[in-house]
Swiss-Prot record, chain C:
Signal peptide: none
Protein name: Cytochrome c-type biogenesis protein CcmE
Gene responsible for this protein: ccmE
Transmembrane portions of the chain: 9-29
GO MF, one example: heme binding
Assigned keywords, A-Z: Cell inner membrane, Cell membrane, Cytochrome c-type biogenesis, Heme, Iron, Membrane, Metal-binding, Signal-anchor, Transmembrane, Transmembrane helix
Organism, scientific name: Acidiphilium cryptum (strain JF-5)
Similarity-based family: Belongs to the CcmE/CycJ family.
PANTHER family found in the cross-reference section: CYTOCHROME C-TYPE BIOGENESIS PROTEIN CCME HOMOLOG, MITOCHONDRIAL
Membrane topology of this protein: Single-pass type II membrane protein
NCBIfam families assigned to the protein according to its UniProt record, in alphabetical order: PRK13254.1-5
Length: 184, 657, 173
């Protein structure tokens, strides 16, 4: 039995093995969010945040792009609304993140000041800074098409991660933490 | 209560499957006759348990027990009874349970009807099947249990996806899954043979009926899936090269190669390695398909709700099954006895050519399907591969297959001369050339090629049958009598090829379709393809769980009434979703296809009209192929212990089977 | 009859010819028919040549959808945006039922001559196996996607008092 003939019989196994490794890697990337075949990729990921200026609400100061880009630590920008139930669902987890030292800046999407105040009073306020986007135009510029959505901004203003879903613990552990670790 | 019992029955089935796999594979080594007989009994009881479990889930759907999360998410109290039953498999968890049920049915069938197979081989086959069953049931129980409960139960269920509320749901998944899963038997035979270290003619004879049954169901499943999307999606398309469709086509291609090469193993004791590898490959492709669709790796309009965690579990199952079998193959296959001798120009040679081309087409489809995710993985580029890619690669590659399909059956075993074989097909060649010329003159190049090829295959299949009954060479009555005495497998083969030709005819005909989109007000009409389409009225209508707007279209031709068509748009109140119900009118050789998209502001609406020449032939051809397979199965050689009566006097020098 | 070795050689040659044909066909097909996906920003930056087919995907910009008829056939114009650029799209035909303002779509087509508009031959709106249409009721139950088409959001102050039926009633009313 020639050696080359023996090797030929092992070829299918090798090919399948390579494929299996590839599939495993694809699955892993799906969990961390770097491969998502269904998504509508937010086009901002990998780019700088768009130019914007948003007013504050209820006596607080808003923020704009230069301020955001000048931060020395990563910032989690969270689009939310008082009328959005899953935003209330993610509120306790945002609270936990804020207490763990993550800078969270909130943008209230198409909302009214009184309602925002009521919401924050009820569910807690994890936001280091808070701005409001009553028309939703800035949200469109960010590629947001619903709430809640969150973006991780690296120092300098580049968007490095995005999720169009509530920040539940699985997403925080599987996606947000690795993304933040990649920045440090 | 009953769902809990169903869950328990499932766990019990898993335990039985584990026992079946251990006893099945280890049994022959212990040479204890009692143990050897246990495996079939275990296989049958596993099926009974799974059957009970599945019935429990169906029951929960029928009575709308919303404490079962699967029922709450995918059914509702307003869903009609048929879809409360069939919606059981219209979602991920329920369909995997159906998969397990059919897998256990395969084992039970081998246990109950495989008495002609040597005991030790049968025991190993059941052991392998038990192992696969156990893996999948473990997956269901661990990660994807349809019996998961929620409390408090919601008042209303979310309802069955409106697009799935169609009689097709009752038919398509079970048939398709039987095809997919059925190849596990051929797989188990291959693995068992590798364990035993022996593949002989008898192995070919045992594998072939099991492979044929699966192939038959898979053909019907794919055929029906195509028909379903044709009349449900409202575009008049029947095949989109969508990843989910491709993963159904792949095992069909290698399965076709398998049933052909099993013939050679049976008759000539050749192509053993090839057949074993094909049997492993076909079921592996089925498993891969399950993985790809349910893990969410592929972007498809048929998307199943998927999660990477489930995908990982299935990937591990795949690694063990496919990796294990191929490892066994790498070590044991070289020891299989070397193949019998034959010349390249012979029926064996033609069958090898057939296998090569089927496998190459499968490889191309596989590459096209996997190209986007792997390109993203390796080079971080996002692209998508669509129908044009497959049209440019697969269609040319079917040309040699079509040419060879008519010639192969004309050739004799071991050594054949090409010219006489081709001469017998002169009639087919002439008609094909005429058809080709007729359509080329009208400027339809692709249709000309397709129709000519289809005619070549169809007439070739009929000539094959004519040769066997010695049509025109003996009195007509004798030819007719011969029809009942020639091996049924021969009739099945002719029918199979004929069916393929008819399907190709339909596909080529569809390339000649005409369509238009129009806004019509009541009383207005347009002309398309020789027919006149007139909008009579638009009125509200009502279904069980939907409200509809129904348009009435009168179709006439040269002033003669042809048909009244009623396309609708439907609005499902539960999910607030709008769907389009196309109206299709067929006369066997062409379809009229009308869709109504919605009202406009002036009392009329937007319409799309199509004429699909030869469309019914696509699915008719598929059914005839499956019928050929079914007739082959009734061949007396496959029946248990029936003696072969030697009624025919053997003429010399001609192609016999 | 030839020896086993020679026959094996013939088989290998046949496989080789078949495989190379297949590979050649694939390479040719890849080059000419892969439809690349571009976002509006990429289209605005790269100006694909007129007639070159590609996929354009993004969000249907609200308040830009205009429907009309041209020669008796229905046509629709709208703009697709990704937040950074927006491209006008012209589509002749029947829009899929899932097409809505403020929602994601993928269109297949090519830029018209003069690089002004995208002529779409197909418009696709996606759905999954669990049908989660973006209307207010489902949005409030699951992932909070809100469709601007369905009107302004409800007042949050009265939120917690409403039962699911009341929410539904207020959204439909």
């Amino acid at each position: 039995m020639s050696v080359s003939r023996r090797m030929l019989f092992g070829l299918p196994l090798l090919v399948v093995g390579a494929g299996g490794v590839g599939f495993y890697e694809l699955l892993r990337r799906m969990r961390t969010g770097s491969y998502n075949p269904q998504a509508f990729d937010n086009p901002l990921v990998g780019h700088d945040v768009p130019d914007f200026t948003l007013p504050g609400v209820n006596g607080r100061k808003g923020f704009d792009k230069p301020v955001l880009a000048a931060q020395k630590r990563p910032v989690l920008v969270n689009f939310f609304a008082s009328w959005c139930v899953p935003c209330a669902g993610e509120a306790p987890y945002l609270d936990r993140l804020a207490k763990a030292g993550v800078d969270i800046w909130g943008i209230a999407y198409q909302d009214k000041p009184e309602a925002i105040a009521l919401y924050l009073a009820k569910y807690g306020n994890p936001y280091a800074r808070l701005a409001t986007d009553p028309s939703g135009r800035t949200a469109i510029n960010w590629g947001v098409y619903g709430v809640p959505e969150s973006f991780l901004i690296a120092p300098g203003g580049k968007v490095v991660w995005h999720i169009a879903a509530p920040l539940v613990p699985e997403i925080i552990d599987d996606q947000l933490r690795p993304a933040m670790q990649r920045l440090t | 209560m009953i769902p809990t019992l169903g869950n328990f029955a499932l766990a019990l089935a898993l335990a039985i499957a584990v026992a079946q796999s251990v006893i099945g594979i280890a049994g022959p080594m212990l040479r204890d006759r009692l143990i050897l007989r246990t495996a079939p009994a275990l296989a049958i009881s596993q099926f009974v348990m799974l059957g009970l479990s599945f019935l429990a889930l169906v029951w929960a759907g029928v009575v709308s027990d919303f404490t079962v999360r699967n029922v709450a998410e995918y059914s509702s109290s307003t869903t009609p009874l048929l879809y409360r039953i069939t919606g059981t498999w219209g979602n991920h968890d329920g369909s995997i349970l159906l998969w397990c049920l059919i897998l256990s049915l395969c084992g039970a069938t081998v246990g109950a009807f495989g008495n002609s197979i040597p005991t030790s081989l049968r025991s190993r086959v059941l052991g392998v099947l038990g192992l696969i069953s156990a893996g999948f049931m473990a997956f269901v129980i661990a990660v994807s249990n349809p019996f998961a409960r929620i409390w408090p139960p919601p008042l209303h269920g979310a309802g069955v996806n409106p697009i799935l509320q169609d009689p097709g749901l009752a038919v398509h998944p079970p048939i398709l899954y039987t095809g997919y899963v059925g190849f596990s038997i051929a797989f188990a035979f291959a693995v068992a043979a590798l364990i035993e270290g022996r593949v002989d003619a008898a192995w070919g004879r045992w594998v072939r009926p099991w492979a044929l049954v699966s192939w038959l169901f898979l053909t019907c499943g794919i055929c029906f899936g195509s028909l379903w999307s044709y009349y449900t999606l409202g575009w008049g398309g029947y095949w989109f090269w969508d990843p989910v469709e491709n993963v159904a086509l792949l095992p069909w291609l290698t399965g076709t190669a398998l049933i052909h090469s099993a013939i050679v193993v049976e008759k000539r004791e050749a192509l053993k390695t090839w057949s074993v590898l094909l049997a492993i490959a076909t079921f592996s492709l089925s498993l891969c398909g399950t993985f790809l669709v349910r893990s969410g790796l592929l972007n498809s309009v048929h998307a199943f709700s998927a999660s990477p965690a489930q995908g990982l579990f299935i990937l591990v199952l795949l690694a063990l099954t496919i990796g294990g079998s191929l490892l066994l193959f790498a070590f044991r296959a070289p020891a299989l006895a070397a193949s019998g001798v034959f010349a390249p120009v012979s029926r064996e040679g033609a069958l090898i050519l057939n296998n090569i081309f089927l496998c190459i087409i499968a490889a191309v489809v596989f590459t096209g399907t996997m190209y986007p995710p792997f390109l993203d993985l390796l080079f971080n580029r996002q692209i998508s591969v669509g129908a044009p890619f497959y049209d440019q690669t697969v269609l040319p590659l079917t040309a040699p297959l079509i040419l060879a399909m008519a010639v192969g059956p004309m050739m004799s075993w071991k050594r054949a001369v090409l010219l006489p074989a081709l001469t017998k097909l002169w009639f087919g060649a002439v008609v094909a050339l005429i058809v080709f010329g007729a359509f080329i003159l009208r400027g339809h190049f692709v249709a000309a090629l397709g129709l000519a090829g289809a005619v070549w295959v169809m007439i070739g299949a009929l000539i094959d049958l004519a040769e066997r009954v010695r049509l025109f060479r003996v009195p007509l009555r004798q030819s007719f009598a011969r029809l009942f005495t020639i091996p049924r497998a021969a009739i099945g083969a002719s029918l199979g090829h004929l069916g393929f030709g008819i399907a190709v005819l339909g596909i080529a005909g569809m390339s000649l379709q005409v369509h238009t989109i129009r806004v019509l007000n009541p009383g207005q009409s347009i002309d398309l393809g020789g027919y006149n389409w007139k909008l009579i009225s638009i009125a509200p209508a009502k279904g069980a769980n939907y409200a509809a707007r129904e348009a009435t279209i009168e179709v006439t031709r040269n002033g003669h009434f042809v048909e009244m068509m009623h396309p609708e748009t439907r609005f499902f109140t539960n999910q607030k979703v709008k769907t389009v119900a196309a109206a299709i009118s067929t006369n066997g050789v062409r379809n009229l296809f009308a869709t109504f998209a919605g009202d406009n502001d002036s009392g009329g609406g937007e319409f799309r009209f199509n004429i699909h020449p030869l469309a019914p032939e696509i699915w008719l051809g598929g059914l005839i192929m499956a019928l050929g397979g079914a007739i082959s199965l009734t061949d007396r050689r496959f029946r248990v212990g029936a003696p072969v009566r030697n009624r025919l006097r053997r003429p010399s020098g001609s192609a016999t089977v | 009859m030839m020896s086993r070795k020679k026959r094996r050689l013939w088989i290998v040659i046949a496989c080789g010819i078949g495989l190379s044909t297949a590979v050649a066909l694939m390479l040719f097909a890849f080059r000419s028919s892969l439809s690349f996906f571009m976002s509006p920003e990429q289209v605005a930056a790269r100006h694909p040549p007129p007639g070159r087919v590609f996929r354009l995907g993004g969000i249907v910009q609200a308040n830009t959808v205009v429907m009309g008829t041209r020669n008796g056939a229905p046509y629709t114009t709208f703009r697709i945006t990704d937040g950074r650029a927006s491209i006008p799209v012209v589509y002749t035909g029947v829009l899929p039922g899932l097409f809505r303002q403020g929602q994601g779509v993928v269109t297949i087509g090519a830029m018209a001559k003069g690089d002004s508009e995208f002529m779409a031959s197909t418009v696709l709106a996606k759905h999954g196996a669990d049908y989660m249409p973006r209307d207010v009721e489902m949005a409030l139950r699951k992932a909070g996607k809100w469709n601007p088409k369905f009107g302004p959001p409800p007042n949050a102050g009265a939120w917690d008092d409403k039962s699911p039926a009341q929410i539904e009633a207020s959204n439909n009313g």
